[in-house]
Each structure stands twice: as C-alpha cells, then as structure tokens.
C-alpha cells in the first residue's frame, strides 16, 4: 500500500495531512486556476490547439489532456499518419494501489457500493461474488439498439468512440477507480491499432456517467458475444481478431470487483464528443471573424466599426479581440483604400453607417467567442477529472460515495456552445442576405450573377434558399437539451445531465455551421471576382466614353473647338458613380441608367449653353445623337472584349485580393480546392463548388489558410492615435 500517485497534491496511497497537502491554500476553490486558463488571446489558444492536434503522440497522465488531443485521436482516420497514445508509467503505482485496496477490502469483508452491493436504486442488495456482479453489470447495461450493420444511424460515430476510450483511460489513470493498469494498457492498444468498439448512439443520460455506451467497451474487453468492433479499414472483426490485431496477448479480461463499475461509471462519451465539437467550434469562431472582415471588404464597408476606442469602452474581451482581428484584416486592405476614395468622392452614395450585420459584428461575435472559450475550459477540466463513484481514497483507507458521474458541465457547456454557434450562423446568414441583394450590396449584381445575361443566370439564388434552411435548423438546435431531464432508474437518477445528448446536438450544429460557412465563403469569393470584373469593365467603359467624347464632342463641323468638349469630365463622373452591373449586360440600352444619365449631362450643358444653342455649329443638343450613336457602335464591343480578357486570366487590372491579408482563404477556394467563378453559362452548379469547400472544412484543410490570414497579428488592437 506504499505505492502512490500525485493528484492535485494528493498522493493516493500515501498517508498525509490532508488539510495541509491536498488543498491549494492560495486557490482552494479553483477559481484562480479557472481564470488563469483564460489568460491570453483566443486566437493564440486556437493556434495552440492546432499545434496539439497535429502532434504524433498523446501522452496520458491523468491531468493534462486537452480538447485538441482528444479531437486528434478521434479523427485519426482523417490523418495520413495515425497519432499514438502513450501511458505515463508514473501512473502505474497509483492505479495499482487503488486496485489492490479494493481486493484487500473485499477480503476483509468491507461493504462497498458496486463491489458487494447492487447498483443504484437496488443498492440494498448484497453479494460476496464480486466478479459475477461486475459481469452482470455489463450484461444488463448492454441495453442499446444498433439496427443493422456497424455503420447504421443508431451507432455512435467511431470517432466519438475513440474519443470516449481516450478520456476514460485518462480518468482511470489517476488511481481513484480500483481497476488494473493492464486493462488501461489493453484499451490503449485498441486505440493505437484503430480497433473501435461499436457503441449505441442513444441510451445514456450522462449520470451515472454514460453507463450504456461505456458498457459496450467493457463488453469488448470481456469478450461478450454481442460486442462488435471494426478494424482500421472499417472491416468487422470477431472477438478473437480484435485482440490479436491490437496485440493484446492476455486474452479476455475476467473483471475483478469494482472494475466493471470503473469502466462504465464515467462521463467519457459525453465529454469525448464535446471535445471534438469544441475543437471545431473554436476554429469556426475564428473563421466567422475573418469572414466578417472579408464581408466588409467586398461590401465597400467603412472600417471605422473596428476602432479600438469603441470596443475598449464596452470592456468585453471577446468583442475587443473580434474587432482587433477584423481591424487587422482590413488594415492596409486594397478594398478599404478603394472604398475610402469612393466615399470621399460621393459621401451620399451609401448610408453614413453600415448596417448592423457588418457594423456590430464584433459586438455580436464577441460574446459567442467568450462562451465557446469558457465551454472549452469547462470540458478540459471534465476530461481531466475523476468522475466515477465510489472513489477509492487509499490514503484514508476509505471509499467515498459521491456524484462526480453527474455530467452537468457537459450538458451546460454544450447547450451554451450550441446557442453560440446558432448566433454565429444567424450573423452569417444576415451578411449573406445583404451580399446577394443588389439593394444593399453597393453595386454587386443581384444574386451575385456573373454571366452576360442576367435573365438566364440566377447566380446564388438557390444557395440563399439553402442558407435560409441551414439557419432555420441551426436556430432550432439552439434550444436547450438540459431542460428536458426525466427522472430515471426508479427515481434514483432523478436529475441527470443529458450531456451526450447535448453534445450530439451540438455536433449537428457544427456540421450545419460548416455548411453555412462553406456556402458563405464561396459567395464571398464570387463577390471578390465580381469586384475584379467590375473594376476591369468599368475601366473599359471609362476609356471608351472618354474616347467617344473626344471624337464626337470636342470639335465642331469646321474643326473649331466645340462647347460640348467641357462635358467629358462630368460624363466620366457618371461612369465612376454608376454601378456597373446595372447596365453591364447591355451598356447602351436606353432603359438602363448609364445612357440615361450620360444624356442628362449633355442636356444639362445644352440648357446652360444659352444663345449658342441656336447656332448649329455650337449646339450641344446637336451633338447628342452623334455621341450616342458612336457609343452604341463601340461600347458593347469594348465591354465584351474586357470581359473576355478577364476570363482569359490576363486582365488589365489585377485582382485586388492578392494585396489583402484575406488572400489565403481566396487562394484556398480558387486554387487549392479548385473552384471557379459561377455563371449560368457554365454547367457547374453552386452546390458542386460549395461541396469542395465543405470538404476542406471537414478535413481540416481550411485551418492553415485561416491562420495565415492572421499570422502577422501581434495580438493587440491598433493603438489609438
């Protein structure tokens, strides 16, 4: 019994003065530790998570497991090189001490819950056959339903099962559960060999832990005939094959007293899935900040909304960081510089302030980031906790009967995370709706149509409908799970966390937000290319109008200077101010605003020409027909020529996005993923392109370009000058 394990200053198996050694006198309630975990920026934390996710080894000792490491083990199938789990050898002694204590207490006739007693509401029953009791525990908990096959809709995703196995090992390593170290080694070998038990998707209330699903891991370890597992390539394996492939040479385990309870009485399935969900949620939170900044770029937004003073006066750290990240993306942006010139040229062309979806995006996203970050820390505390019952306190020679199996931190953090994800999605939908609406988008075409004939090209209209569907489902999922608790197990489990159910619903929300983010990113790239097309076509229109004005307005019939020559400057101002896509499909149509406003300039000058209008040689009215006829003869050809040059990849004016910090995401979508500008003239549908980007979200390809956008950010807002 001299063996020991250090846990938060408490050496299990070694007598001590608990009052002096087991409590941190400076932080007895752990609030300081919780606050300290939030030090630094959220972005730095996300970068750290990504680094941890990519490490080849996860070393378990019971106290340092992270959300990113759980996600890494869970997603091993998506990696070219599998990450491996190693157990800290220093944990062996403490694990053995608690296991030995159980066997010794059994030998002494000590009455212990789950060792000599029945379970839950039937704990009044007694038995001396501890091994048989554990065997029966696993049998009666195997109450899940799978349907047909190992990949049916009623089977927990194998990634979530791997996460649960890892988290359960981490808990048991702390040496308070009364289980042999050899069983933990066997589970580790199963993980490292990619042998995954099949667990039921439903059937747990995550209090007394995740009893039903965890019993199927125990069933595999004990060789139950109904247990199922799949191998590295998804193949079904029988009981003997599982252990042989994993290199477990000891054969199936005969559970000792308490070991069955140690395997099933914990929150690992809920907290494992929550870890996976939160890894992706943190990435999506940063993505929403960057996408909001790109939205500001393509909408000719005013960057004033990111000014540090505004957010400093509001005090919320999530808001301050969100604004600072957007400010960093927009600082020096070529789009912002161009928009500033536009606003200076015609300050009344758009509202003084941008709409809420842009202007208040830091205020909207900030609280969601704080919620997701707090939930991440709560789950990290949970996956490093001892969360079963009873707890074996070797140092005080007693079993403690409590309720650490209550997974309330999981249910609450997942409900909160899901609400935050729904709020992010709502903002994304609001921004998307502005982007595709030509009443709001500052000159982009309706539906972001890029074809020559808008009557035969409806752009992203279908995608907008899909976004409404995604957003509606996401808002529905924002409803809490934890207020639907039912009293269970003869009213013994009369309050329960529903942690896994909430985690599952949050995983659904993550998938939907990835669909929304993919659709939105494709739309933003469409808008970027439309701004590029707009700039090139407008340049062609300006040059053509200038040339036609010089040719038809500058000289009179006898070679003398004509008063109409003074119209050129205002004609070019019309071109500059008029949204190109209001006339680009037929630039000389008399029903479109370009020709109407060009004519109005000439008419206004003619009205001011006074007596000179009576002279045919100096009349501006007489020049209107010649100007319009010449423009109709050359402008459509010049516009089409400019469009063809852009489509060929050799535009007169390069794409501004290459000069922006947001370029890495555009590069990913257009070059690495291989999408292109969507038009009705092509066969490819929006869904095909969005699918490519969605795949990049799902396989993690999106992460590096996202972080590259922010690689030069120093973690602080631009100082107030």
UniProtKB/Swiss-Prot annotation:
NCBIfam families: phe_am_lyase (TIGR01226). Its EC number is 4.3.1.24. Contains an active site 4-methylidene-imidazol-5-one (MIO), which is formed autocatalytically by cyclization and dehydration of residues Ala-Ser-Gly. Pathway: Phenylpropanoid metabolism; trans-cinnamate biosynthesis; trans-cinnamate from L-phenylalanine: step 1/1. One of its GO terms (cellular component) is protein-containing complex. The keyword Aminoacyl-tRNA synthetase does not apply. It is found in: Cytoplasm. (E)-cinnamate binds at residues 265, 353, 359, 389, 461, 489, 492. This is Phenylalanine ammonia-lyase. The active site is at residue 113. InterPro entries: Aromatic_Lyase (IPR001106), Fumarase/histidase_N (IPR024083), L-Aspartase-like (IPR008948), Phe/His_NH3-lyase_AS (IPR022313), Phe_NH3-lyase (IPR005922), Phe_NH3-lyase_shielding_dom_sf (IPR023144). GO terms for molecular function: ammonia-lyase activity; phenylalanine ammonia-lyase activity. Gene3D superfamilies: Fumarase/aspartase (Central domain), Fumarase/aspartase (N-terminal domain), Phenylalanine ammonia-lyase 1, domain 3. The modification 2,3-didehydroalanine (Ser) is found at residue 208.
